[in-house]
């Protein structure tokens, strides 16, 4: 769902 996509984006930024 949309929340899953948001979590992936947040996780990506958290990996920077």
Swiss-Prot record:
Q: Cellular component per GO?
A: extracellular region
UniProt keywords (A-Z) are:
Amidation, Amphibian defense peptide, Antibiotic, Antimicrobial, Secreted
Q: In its keyword annotation, does this UniProt entry include Secreted?
A: yes
Q: Which domain of life is it from?
A: Eukaryota
Q: Which residues carry this modification: Leucine amide?
A: 16
What tissue specificity is annotated for this entry?
Answer: Expressed by the skin glands.
Question: Which GO BP terms sit in this record?
Answer: defense response to bacterium
Cellular location of this protein? Answer: Secreted
User: What's this protein's family per the entry?
Assistant: Belongs to the frog skin active peptide (FSAP) family. Aurein subfamily.
Sum up the protein's function in the record's words: Has antimicrobial activity against B.cereus, L.lactis, L.innocua, M.luteus, S.epidermidis and S.uberis. Probably acts by disturbing membrane functions with its amphipathic structure.
For this entry, the protein name equals: Aurein-2.1
**Organism encoding this protein:** Ranoidea raniformis
């Amino acid at each position: 769902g949309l929340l899953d996509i948001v979590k992936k984006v947040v996780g990506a930024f958290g990996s920077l």
